[in-house]
C-alpha cells in the first residue's frame, strides 16, 4: 500500500479574508458589495438617529430663518425630520471638513447630505450583494433586478430631483411630516397627479398589493386535504413542512370560475413573474417620472381648456387642481418668496408717466 502525502499550502491572511468574505456558508453573506454596504449603512443609520434626536435647527431656505427638525428642539415622532441641506450650499459637496466649524456644518444641514449619500451608496451595494449571492449560489439575477425599483425610487427622490432643481434643499426631508410636505410641494410645482408615469406607478403599487393579497389567499385556501371531512383541514399539516401544501390546479379552477377561464394562471412561473414584474415596472416608471419632473418636464396642463361659444371658461377638474396647486405653492417657503412662481413669472404691465 502506497500513501501519498501532499504538503498543505498555507493560505495567506488576505486569502483567508477573501474566502471568508465570499463564503456562502456564513450565517449572513457578506460579499464584496457587503464590504462597502456595511460601513455606509451603519454611518447613515447612526447619523440619522443622532440628528433626529439632537440636531440644531437648519437654515433650509438660506434666508437666515432656521427650521427645527429634531426631538430635543421641540418636535415629536410625527413632526420630526432631518432637515435638508441649506439652499446656500446648493449642490456643493459639503463634508464636515468643508465647513469652518461643526456648528456651521450643522446650521447648514450637513447631516442630511451625509445621510443621503451614504444611504444611497449602501442600498446600491445591498442590490449588488443580492446579485453576488445569487451568482455564487447558481441562481438567476432577478432578485436584484426587482430590488432595483425601490433603489431607483430612492435615488430619484434624494439625488436626481435635487440635481434637477439645483439644490439639496429641494430633496425630501427624512421624516414623516417632511415626506408629506415634499409630496404636497411636488404636486404644487410639478402637477405629478397629471403625469402618466405617476399613474403607472399607482397602478403598479395598488395592483401589486391586490395581486399579492389574491395570490396569498388563494394559496392558503386551496389546501391538499390530508384529513377527513370531520376534521379541520389545518390538522393535516405541520408548520414548515417540505411537502407541497396547496394545489395550483384547484386554485386555477376556483379563480377561473370566479372571473373567467383565462384570467387565472395554470403555470406557477408565469404567475410569479407577473407578481414580480407588475409592481417593479410600475415603480420604475414612477422613478422615471420623478427624474423627468426634476428637470421641470411636468405633468399635463389642461387649465382653462374648455370654453363656451362666447369664449368664457368652463371650469373642469383640471382647473380645480390648478387652483389647489397655486394655494399649496403660496403656503410653502412663505418667507422665501411672496408669490407662487407661476404668478411671479408674469411680466408686470408697463406704465407711462
Curated annotation (Swiss-Prot):
[CaMn4O5] cluster binds at residues 170, 189, 332-333, 342, 344. The modification Phosphothreonine is found at residue 2. InterPro entries: D1/D2, Photo_II_D1/D2_sf, Photo_RC_L/M, Photo_RC_L/M_CS, PSII_D1. The D1/D2 heterodimer binds P680, chlorophylls that are the primary electron donor of PSII, and subsequent electron acceptors. It shares a non-heme iron and each subunit binds pheophytin, quinone, additional chlorophylls, carotenoids and lipids. D1 provides most of the ligands for the Mn4-Ca-O5 cluster of the oxygen-evolving complex (OEC). There is also a Cl(-1) ion associated with D1 and D2, which is required for oxygen evolution. The PSII complex binds additional chlorophylls, carotenoids and specific lipids. Its main location: plastid. It catalyses: 2 a plastoquinone + 4 hnu + 2 H2O = 2 a plastoquinol + O2. GO terms for molecular function: chlorophyll binding; electron transporter, transferring electrons within the cyclic electron transport pathway of photosynthesis activity; iron ion binding; oxidoreductase activity, acting on diphenols and related substances as donors, oxygen as acceptor; oxygen evolving activity. It is found in: Plastid, Chloroplast thylakoid membrane. The keyword rRNA-binding does not apply. Gene3D superfamilies: Photosystem II protein D1-like. Keywords: Acetylation, Calcium, Chlorophyll, Chloroplast, Chromophore, Electron transport, Herbicide resistance, Iron, Magnesium, Manganese, Membrane, Metal-binding, Oxidoreductase, Phosphoprotein, Photosynthesis, Photosystem II, Plastid, Thylakoid, Transmembrane, Transmembrane helix, Transport. GO terms for biological process: photosynthetic electron transport in photosystem II; response to herbicide. Tyr-161 forms a radical intermediate that is referred to as redox-active TyrZ, YZ or Y-Z. C-terminally processed by CTPA; processing is essential to allow assembly of the oxygen-evolving complex and thus photosynthetic growth. Chlorophyll a ChlzD1 binds at residue 118. Pheophytin a binds at residue 126. It is a multi-pass membrane protein. Fe cation binds at residues 215, 272. The chain crosses the membrane at residues 29-46, 118-133, 142-156, 197-218, 274-288. NCBIfam families: psbA. Belongs to the reaction center PufL/M/PsbA/D family. 2 of the reaction center chlorophylls (ChlD1 and ChlD2) are entirely coordinated by water. PSII is composed of 1 copy each of membrane proteins PsbA, PsbB, PsbC, PsbD, PsbE, PsbF, PsbH, PsbI, PsbJ, PsbK, PsbL, PsbM, PsbT, PsbX, PsbY, PsbZ, Psb30/Ycf12, at least 3 peripheral proteins of the oxygen-evolving complex and a large number of cofactors. It forms dimeric complexes. This is Photosystem II protein D1. It comes from Dioscorea elephantipes.
Amino acid at each position: 500500500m502506497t500513501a501519498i502525502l501532499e504538503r498543505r499550502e498555507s493560505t495567506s491572511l488576505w486569502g483567508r479574508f477573501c474566502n471568508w468574505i465570499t463564503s456562502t456558508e456564513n450565517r449572513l453573506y457578506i460579499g464584496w458589495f457587503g464590504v462597502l454596504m456595511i460601513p455606509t449603512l451603519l454611518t447613515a443609520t447612526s447619523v440619522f438617529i443622532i440628528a433626529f434626536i439632537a440636531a440644531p435647527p437648519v437654515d433650509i431656505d438660506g434666508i437666515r430663518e432656521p427650521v427645527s427638525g429634531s426631538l430635543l428642539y421641540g418636535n415629536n415622532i410625527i413632526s420630526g425630520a432631518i432637515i435638508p441641506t441649506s439652499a446656500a450650499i446648493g449642490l456643493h459637496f459639503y463634508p464636515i471638513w468643508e465647513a469652518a466649524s461643526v456648528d456651521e456644518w450643522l446650521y447648514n444641514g450637513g447631516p442630511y447630505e451625509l445621510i443621503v449619500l451614504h444611504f444611497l451608496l449602501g442600498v446600491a451595494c445591498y442590490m449588488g450583494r443580492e446579485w453576488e449571492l445569487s451568482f455564487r449560489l447558481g441562481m438567476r439575477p432577478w432578485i436584484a433586478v426587482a430590488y432595483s425599483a425601490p433603489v431607483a425610487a430612492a435615488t430619484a427622490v434624494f439625488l436626481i430631483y435635487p440635481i434637477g432643481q439645483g439644490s439639496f434643499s429641494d430633496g425630501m426631508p427624512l421624516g414623516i411630516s417632511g415626506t408629506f410636505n415634499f409630496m404636497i410641494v411636488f404636486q404644487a410645482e410639478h402637477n405629478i397627479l397629471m403625469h402618466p408615469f405617476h399613474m403607472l406607478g399607482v397602478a403598479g403599487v395598488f395592483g401589486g398589493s391586490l395581486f399579492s393579497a389574491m395570490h396569498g389567499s388563494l394559496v392558503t385556501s386551496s389546501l391538499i386535504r390530508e384529513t377527513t371531512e370531520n376534521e379541520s383541514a389545518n390538522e393535516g399539516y405541520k408548520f414548515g413542512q417540505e411537502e407541497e401544501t396547496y394545489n395550483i390546479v384547484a386554485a386555477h379552477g376556483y379563480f377561473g370560475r370566479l372571473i373567467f377561464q383565462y384570467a387565472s394562471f395554470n403555470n406557477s412561473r408565469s404567475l410569479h413573474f407577473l407578481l414580480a414584474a407588475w409592481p417593479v415596472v410600475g415603480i420604475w416608471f414612477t422613478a422615471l417620472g420623478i427624474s423627468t419632473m426634476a428637470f421641470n418636464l411636468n405633468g399635463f396642463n389642461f387649465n382653462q381648456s374648455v370654453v363656451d361659444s362666447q369664449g368664457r371658461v368652463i371650469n373642469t377638474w383640471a382647473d380645480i387642481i390648478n387652483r389647489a396647486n397655486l394655494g399649496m405653492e403660496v403656503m410653502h417657503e412663505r418667507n422665501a418668496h411672496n408669490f407662487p412662481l407661476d404668478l411671479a413669472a408674469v411680466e408686470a404691465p408697463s406704465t407711462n408717466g
